[in-house]
């Protein structure tokens, strides 16, 4: 096992369930002495003589004193999450009891696991590659159906299989080209250049699709920030509360009530939107607190992915709309024009007044056309339906490495077009293989691995 190479011949222990009071807590051990350590504490059965993937009920005892009645799950190597012997102890969910069990394991020879160390051992023991390991972290942090399904698809090897096939094909052709170099004086060609060209063209299309999926993947994983801007008392706080179905922001008839930005999260069709209710933009305010809020609004526009410009259809003019569009366009942000309080003016009259603009007319207070606004928000960030069965890139590290893969494939294709020599072609292939292997972890910097796994929770 590779853990011996990394000096991991010890046994680790950690709480695998969230800290705090609960019905049960699960303590996980992994390593060469996991079974022996638990055997010293669990006297009901000799776990070393039990079959893998079995469950046993009994008491944890230390110095002949009962600690807790537990359920022990046994997973013998290599058929476990880490590829090592793994024992999971299900005890009562008291933090005190959990710590008693953990400390007893440590006294018998285990050490406390580092964040992500169980998954790191699974990676180093070949139970999963680096993309799958990162998908495990994504599942743990997922907070929508779309993010969970996308991460699950990648954890099952959806992304890995694509890279594996490309890598194996490149290695096969690379070996043939390297063989040609050994017979360079005989002018023989083992690698079919036509087939290789077709392979590179296909790989380029697949890589391009993966790169293009990152925009959607980033939305699925991290959500979209939406700044709600407009003049004071346009109804921004009312709209925020309507979208959230609760009274979060202060709503008042007094202009300039929102003195600071208010942020809330809403899930619309599996996409997280971080809605930012901002202070109204009023250039000639003399209120110091309000002026600070206005400045924060400008900053939030710069930081947001989308902008909703909300205006009162009864008081604003076409000139106001043109001014607002100019302000937002200068920031290069996508925006939606939303005319509020249409119930007072009437939708037809409002549409006639602002003809020529793409505007959604609503009544935030009267709950009119809110669903239309939600649909537009989703359409702004998602083209068509989200198909989580397809491989979607959500990780910036993968995206950056795939850009290098795409560039390398272009270099290989250019080399084939220009009939470059085999040695130069082999260099381009090796470069491409390097970046593919960097994604999957076939070659990895130890510092990179430590950084990736440090983001996991302890116990995973």
Give the residues covered by each predicted segment.
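Catalytic P-loop NTP-binding/switch module of NTPases
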Residues: 290-293, 297
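Generic enzyme active-site microenvironment
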Residues: 275, 310, 338
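Glycine-rich, N-terminal phosphate-binding loop of Rossmann-like dinucleotide-binding domains
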Residues: 93, 243, 278, 311-314
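Switch I (G2) and immediately adjacent beta-strands of P-loop GTPase domains
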Residues: 57-76, 256-285
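A glycine-rich (often HGG/GG-containing) alpha/beta subdomain
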Residues: 1-149, 153, 157, 331, ...
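Short, Asp-centered acidic motifs that coordinate Mg2+ and/or phosphate
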Residues: 273, 306, 336
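C-terminal-of-GTPase-core extension/linker across diverse P-loop GTPases
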Residues: 3-15, 19, 58, 148-267, ...
